[in-house]
Swiss-Prot record:
A motif ('KMSKS' region) lies at residues 632-636. This is Leucine--tRNA ligase. It is an enzyme of class 6 (ligase). InterPro entries: aa-tRNA-synth_I_CS, aa-tRNA-synth_Ia, Leu-tRNA-ligase, Leu_tRNA-synth_edit, M/V/L/I-tRNA-synth_anticd-bd, Methionyl/Leucyl_tRNA_Synth, Rossmann-like_a/b/a_fold, tRNAsynth_Ia_anticodon-bd. One of its GO terms (biological process) is leucyl-tRNA aminoacylation. It catalyses: tRNA(Leu) + L-leucine + ATP = L-leucyl-tRNA(Leu) + AMP + diphosphate. Keywords: Aminoacyl-tRNA synthetase, ATP-binding, Cytoplasm, Ligase, Nucleotide-binding, Protein biosynthesis. It comes from the Bacteria. It is found in: Cytoplasm.
Amino acid sequence: MHEQYQPLEIETQAQNYWKEHQSFLVRELPDKEKFYCLSMFPYPSGKLHMGHVRNYTIGDVISRYHRMQGRNVLQPMGWDAFGMPAENAAMKNNVAPAAWTYDNIAYMKSQLDSLGLAIDWSREVTTCKPDYYRWEQWLFTRLFEKGVIYRKNGTVNWDPVDQTVLANEQVIDGRGWRSGALIEKREIPMYYFKITAYAEELLESLDNLPGWPEQVKTMQRNWIGKSRGMEIGFPYDQASIGHAGQLKVFTTRPDTLMGATYVAVAAEHPLATQAAQNDPQLQAFIDECKRGGVAEADIATQEKKGMATSLFVEHPLTGDKLPVWVANYVLMNYGEGAVMAVPGHDERDFEFANKYGLPIRQVIAKVEGDNDFESSVWKEWYGAKDESVLTVNSGKYDNLGYQAAFDAIGADLEAKGLGQARTQFRLRDWGISRQRYWGCPIPIIHCEACGDVPVPADQLPVVLPEDVVPDGSGSPLAKMPEFYECNCPKCGQPAKRETDTMDTFVESSWYFARYACPQFEGGMLDRKAADYWLPVDQYIGGIEHAILHLLYARFFHKLMRDEGLVGSDEPFKNLLTQGMVVADTYYRTTANGGKDWFNPADVEVERDAKAKVVGARLKSDGQPVEIGGTEKMSKSKNNGVDPQSMIDQYGADTCRLFMMFASPPDMSLEWSDAGVEGANRFLRRVWRLAHAHVSAGLPGALDVAALSDAQKQVRRAIHLAIRQASQDVGQHHKFNTAIAAVMTLMNVLEKAPNQDAQDRALIQEGLETVVLLLAPITPHICHVLWGQLGHAEAVIDARWPSVDESALVQDTLQLVVQVNGKLRGHIDVAASASREDVEAAARANENVLRFTEGLSIRKVIVVPGKLVNIVAN
């Protein structure tokens, strides 16, 4: 055993052992309890960043801990390999996305191996390979035949120069990110998953996920957005519109209907089109609206704009004429593309009405307190629907609470055939068509005679050609007759293959299930294997995936269940959302007002006498730089730390230990070079103590019955550490406090006497405990030390230590003694001492006598096992 800790040598030795013994290869063992631990798989961008390292280390610690509990543990890994970055890199480097992707996968896989992750690589999936997406296409055809997938026109961002559809994030200030052209909104045929058919179940089954963070469940509930309201028909004013009809709106606030003063429609609404026919200004405004973003988030933040039309509708209860406006905040795909506006009691309508001088009518009043209604200043209570408000200025509906007004107005609308109660969801159907090359081909053939025909199962997969280098102008597949020319599977006539590809969220919506049976060729899933492993017991990933990915994966799991592929209702039993990795930022402002960012490694920090940071200089020129505070590690802020350089310098175990010790997993982790140094120092201490112990020769067995009082205290420290770490790792995932418990134990072991066989046997038990408790966190050093401590089997196959409760029992206790709440001393008493004995010992304490001299003792408070407080005056 080397005297010095040599991480590179140790880590190579451990990793070679795991590889040779296929330590992480698992099979279904029906008689053994399983544990499926999964970290969200990475996009193969080129190299790992610290966020990846944190995510995968957390998963690895949990996996290894459960293996030490005797469970059959699956921890797989794969690659979310389709997507736009590969196309962008391909255009930049003039290389096919496939080649770029596979090169990145090879490099990132070697990085994951260097971290020492307990991954079963025999189950690796790569989503851009036909053996994976073939089954996605198969499910698509099944769902298309059942009507769960359908085709309809959808609004997209169209770049007229590049002749392509852009994602919302590729539209910057209304222009294409590459071409700079003004973006148009276009209607094109797209495929949709009918996720709304599962909205109720997706909402209700959140209640069956106690192992999910409440924050994530709330975000999903809000996204699904179930609301009870009414669909109300506003009859057309035939004089202005020219024919009969109704403008249908959905509202959750029919109680405020008497306050409606106008209606607003989307730019694409038929009434907007009609009104613009003889109004060039309105047409120009509609065109401007169509150039705006199509995402709800864009619409929420953009300036609210509108324009009046010459059209009117009638108020369904009063018959009053209400003007029809076109507004940029109304979505055509929400309800029927129209909203009723009640400016008095909706903040968005209130701002809009004030901007354009539209009437604001109060129909709700606060019962008490500040109940003045001002039409120029919005107050929170205007939008209330609780017991603090009642209806006013509403004729026969006056003095009613929210529910009573809802019911009364609703009943009258239903009687007139102008309204019906409805439950609506904010959730929209999921459009998955992408006019891109690097994605899974949609398995549909368009035939003039037969319509849209799914590709038959025996003709799947529809293989994406991998030798294409996109140039950014339109979809490459649409320019490849060899790809799209085909015959109709139904009638045999010449037909055209669909050239759109699927949203990459589709691949990540079912990968967790394919890990159960990645080589299975008899179907999408092997039901037996899927039912053994699923649901995932612990899923780990960033909070940024709280809505889309996690919602789509839950949806897909239910689709697969209804297809008979899995037996469970939910994919992920427990969810851990890890925090970000943040680091200091430094910059200089450039002449044009921009910022040049400098990596923390290139900056020297200046501190005052109290070690507070007072300035920073660039090492290369010695000149000052601005301190930008701590932010998420990113390329844009140049504050990332390359994991590979850390592993090369300190070893993977140091990286892993720092990551787990610096912060609880669900909180942000602040990168600190000093913290990494500290983690490395601690591992060197463990190695040093073990080396000294092993060099002296391994001791015989410990005789627990013959321990001295001092030795009992050492053994108690060992078992306190086991108890603490078992709770922290196994129950709470508080790895930082588990590590702190091991550090406390190390302090005890380093000071423990080393005189006789009992002392050495006790240090042996202590070191074995340190190694076992650290094994999930720093597996390489523990692999080597376990062997050096005399064990034939590898630590990967060892069991987690159990607490010897008898070791925790104390013959004597040390109690704190206070006088009037202030610490005045300590007393040692027998663990079995009575309250009277404890009080007598406290009163007799030398310090207590000094601080109570001349005072009357009023009472003595004894907290058993902890303290005595003497109250005197």
